[in-house]
Amino acid sequence: MARRPARCYRYCKNKPYPKSRYNRAVPDSKIRIFDLGRKRAGVDEFPLCIHLVSNEYEQITSEALEAARICANKYLVKIGGKDSFHLRVRAHPFHVVRINKMLSCAGADRLQTGMRHAFGKPNGLVARVNIGQILMSVRTKDSSRATAIEALRRCQYKFPGQQRIIVSKKWGFSQYARDEYIEKRSRGEIIPDGCYAKFLNKRGSLQEKLDLFPEASFNLA
């Protein structure tokens, strides 16, 4: 039987139905890789962050997420090179959709029960997204801003509904605004931690803070 069109599963009508010990024999998700590009680049290397945000409350199939991932990755690698960006898919397909297979051949009424026992069997996985939820994010250098925006624009053709592209005010994937990050980094109150950053808080052992943040100035008065 051919794959049912994704428009049949676009709207969030029922409760979330994840894979569990009661819901077995679920097909594998089509998307298996969620981070691409230079994943190990430090937080200081890619200050610019751009998001693709959903404008609708809907379901997106794992096939659509995989198609968008391939589309964005190909364009970014072609224009900027494989080490010029870090792409992350932030919508994960956990909701299981079902199908009640119906026969259309002659004598089908003798072989099946129609809409009796019509619960259906697992057919695929979709991601349930809300309005304002981030679907994909790219962190890169300021010089690659136009390339990243164009890559995410092309991804919009792989998704149903409407999306918008937002240039984040944060520094990369961190939680700090760009001005705040530069200021605290110069004072030694922030240290890189992969693609994120650790910040100096006012709790905990003073000796641990001195070991972690040797460049920070501590007011012990």
Curated annotation (Swiss-Prot):
InterPro entries: Ribosomal_uL16, Ribosomal_uL16_CS_euk_arc, Ribosomal_uL16_dom, Ribosomal_uL16_euk_arch, Ribosomal_uL16_sf
GO biological process: cytoplasmic translation; translation
Keyword Ribonucleoprotein assigned: yes
Gene Ontology CC: one annotated term: cytosol
GO MF term (any one): structural constituent of ribosome
Superkingdom, natural source: Eukaryota
A Pfam entry, by short name: Ribosomal_L16
Recorded family membership: Belongs to the universal ribosomal protein uL16 family.
Note: There are 2 genes for uL16 in S.pombe.
Listed name of the protein: Large ribosomal subunit protein uL16A
Organism, as annotated: Schizosaccharomyces pombe (strain 972 / ATCC 24843)
